[in-house]
Amino acid sequence: DAIVKQNNDGILYLFKKNKVTFFHGRGAFNKAVEGGYEIQVTGKNAETLVAKQVIVATGSNARPLPGVEFDEQQILSNDGALAVNAVPKKLGVIGSGVIGLEMGSVWRRLGADVTVLEGMPTFLAAVDEQVAKEAKKAFDKQGLKIELGVKIGDIKKSKKGVTVAYTNA
């Protein structure tokens, strides 16, 4: 929690330093107007504003697998993975999207043996092919194990940990 707070405070400091106004809530672009865009911000401090330049921070939410619930003890979301107090010996990450790769990379650099399981047959399929190739090389160099084209089977919890059964499609 302290690390996340420190990062958030650092971002808010950079906003202030660069004269960026921060609005917390959900935003919707209503229409283009003279001087920029009309934006409706909903939430605790709802308001409509006009801005010439806008940064949209989309946040992130982990997508659960059908029949698998995040208990934040053994089966972790990205939020739970950031709250772990000790480096796990082994860690399995399901999905090689931005969140999965970030979590896997962080824990690998901290010493965990990390395997990333991806259902797609290609690495970072939505990204430019050359960028994906270079990213794959960087992750391989870190020691991140990436399995592509896998089908996730049973996920079982026990006192010793979690077992993820998977097959190569």
Regions found by a protein language model. Give the residues of each.
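Short hydrophobic alpha-helical segments of the AMP-binding
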Residues: 107
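A non-catalytic, amphipathic alpha-helix used as a structural packing/dimerization or gating element
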Residues: 2-13, 134-141
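Glycine-rich Rossmann-fold phosphate-binding loop(s) that bind the pyrophosphate
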Residues: 94-97, 127
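FAD-binding core/adjacent interface of flavoenzyme oxidoreductases
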Residues: 5-94, 165-169
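A Rossmann-like FAD-binding core segment of flavoenzymes
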Residues: 21-24, 28-41, 110-169
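Charge-dense, low-complexity intrinsically disordered segments
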Residues: 1-2, 126
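N-terminal Rossmann-fold NAD(P) dinucleotide-binding loop
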Residues: 100-101
